[in-house]
UniProtKB/Swiss-Prot annotation:
Statement: the UniProt record of this protein carries the keyword Transferase: yes
UniProt family annotation: Belongs to the methyltransferase superfamily. EgtD family.
Residues that hold L-histidine according to the record: 56, 166, 206, 282-284
Name of the protein described by the UniProt record: Histidine N-alpha-methyltransferase
Source species of the chain: Mycobacterium tuberculosis (strain ATCC 25618 / H37Rv)
One Gene Ontology term of the molecular function aspect: L-histidine N(alpha)-methyltransferase activity
Keywords: Methyltransferase, S-adenosyl-L-methionine, Transferase
One matching Pfam family: Methyltransf_33
Cited function: Catalyzes the SAM-dependent triple methylation of the alpha-amino group of histidine to form hercynine, a step in the biosynthesis pathway of ergothioneine.
C-alpha cells in the first residue's frame, strides 16, 4: 500500500528553531528553554527509561486505559483514519490501530511529527505490521501545519501522553482551537491528560531516586553545547522538580551550583548564571476532569466519552466535532 511523506519543514528548520528558542529563552527572567529540545538521541533514550520507572505512572496508566477501552474508542468514533499527533510506534498506538482494524474500518494512518527521521521509522514499522493500510506521513509543526493533515474519511486525531500538559493555558487553548478548526463533522479527538493528585507523588514521578530524570533534564544543556557551540558546565547544574499548587503543574528547573558564565558561540551570546539561579526547562500541567471537558468545549469540541485507569491517575477524553 502507498506510503507518502509530506515535509513542510526545510532541512535546517529544526536548527533555526533551536537558535531562536535558546537566544530568546536565555535572555528571559527567569531563563527558560522549551522541553522539545530534550529529545535528541540521548534524551529520547533517557525518556524511554523514565517511562519504565516505578515512580513514573503516566505511561502505564494511559496504556491500562487503552487496553481496556480501545475497542470502545473504535466503536464510538467509527474512524477509518488514525491521525497521530506526535508520532511514535508505541504499544499505545498499536492498540488503537488494532482496534480499528478489528472493527474493519482502518484504511489510513497519518503520523504527524516535527522530526522527519522519526516519521520515516514510524512509517516503515507500520507499513511492515499493517499491510494494506495507506500511510500519509506529515512532517510539520503544530503551530503552523495542522492544516496540512490530509482530509477525507472519518478521522480519529490522537494526542496521548498528556503532552497537552506541556502547554500553559493560553497556548493550550490556541492549540485546541486550531485543532478543532481542521477537524470536520464526523472527526474525533482522543486526548490523554494526567490528573491532579498527591503533590509528593507527582514530584517523585519527575524526580526519581535513581537520577534518570535529572540526566534527562541536564541533557538539554549538552544539546545546546553540541548544536550551538556553547560551553555549559553540564554537571554544575542540579535538577529540581517542584509542584506549583497555584497553577496545578509540575515544573522542572536546572539550578546553577555556582556562578557560571556561558558562551553560546553560534549565537554570539554570553549569559551569566548566579549561584542558585534556576532556569525553567519544562512545565507539565495536571488536570481535573471537569476542566478538561470545559477546555474542549471552549475550543468547539464536545466530549462524548471519559475514561480513567482504575486508580484514577490518568484520563482519556474522546471528543467530537
Amino acid at each position: 500500500m502507498r506510503v507518502s511523506v509530506a515535509n513542510h519543514l526545510g532541512e535546517d528548520a529544526g536548527h533555526l528553531a533551536l537558535r531562536r528558542d535558546v537566544y530568546s529563552g536565555l535572555q528571559k527572567t527567569p531563563k527558560s528553554l522549551p522541553p522539545k529540545w530534550f529529545y535528541d538521541t540521548v534524551g529520547s533514550e533517557l525518556f524511554d527509561q523514565i517511562t519504565r520507572l516505578p515512580e513514573y505512572y503516566p505511561t502505564r496508566a494511559e496504556a491500562e486505559i487503552l487496553r481496556a477501552r480501545s475497542a470502545e474508542v473504535a466503536s464510538a468514533c467509527r474512524a477509518d483514519t488514525l491521525v497521530e499527533l506526535g508520532s511514535g510506534t508505541s504499544e499505545k498506538t498499536r492498540m488503537l490501530l488494532d482496534a480499528l482494524r478489528h472493527r474493519g474500518s482502518l484504511r489510513r494512518f497519518v503520523p504527524f511529527d516535527v522530526d522527519a527521521s522519526v516519521l520515516s521509522a514510524t512509517a516503515t514499522a507500520i507499513q511492515r505490521e499493517y499491510s494494506g493500510v495507506e500511510i500519509n506521513a506529515v512532517c510539520g509543526d503544530f503551530e503552523e501545519h495542522l492544516t496540512e493533515i490530509p482530509r477525507g474519511g472519518r478521522r480519529l486525531f490522537v494526542f496521548l501522553g498528556s503532552t497537552i500538559g506541556n502547554l500553559t493555558p493560553g497556548p493550550r487553548a490556541q492549540f485546541l482551537t486550531a485543532l478543532a478548526g481542521v477537524m470536520r463533522p464526523g472527526d474525533s479527538l482522543l486526548l490523554g491528560t494526567d490528573l491532579v493528585k498527591d503533590a509528593a507523588r507527582l514530584v517523585r514521578a519527575y524526580d526519581d531516586p535513581g537520577g534518570v530524570t535529572a540526566q534527562f533534564n541536564r541533557n538539554v544543556l549538552a544539546v545546546i553545547n553540541r548544536e550551538l557551540e556553547a560551553d555549559f558546565d553540564v554537571d554544575a547544574f542540579q535538577h529540581v522538580a517542584r509542584w506549583n499548587s497555584a497553577e496545578e503543574r509540575i515544573e522542572m528547573w536546572l539550578r546553577a551550583d555556582g556562578r557560571q558564565r556561558v558562551r553560546v558561540g553560534a549565537l554570539d551570546l554570553t549569559v551569566d548564571f548566579d549561584a542558585g539561579e534556576e532556569m525553567l526547562t519544562e512545565v507539565s500541567c495536571k488536570f481535573r476532569p471537569q476542566a478538561v471537558g470545559a477546555e474542549l468545549a471552549a475550543a468547539g469540541l464536545h466530549r462524548i466519552r471519559w475514561w480513567t485507569d482504575e486508580a484514577g491517575d490518568f484520563g482519556l477524553s474522546l471528543a467530537a466535532k
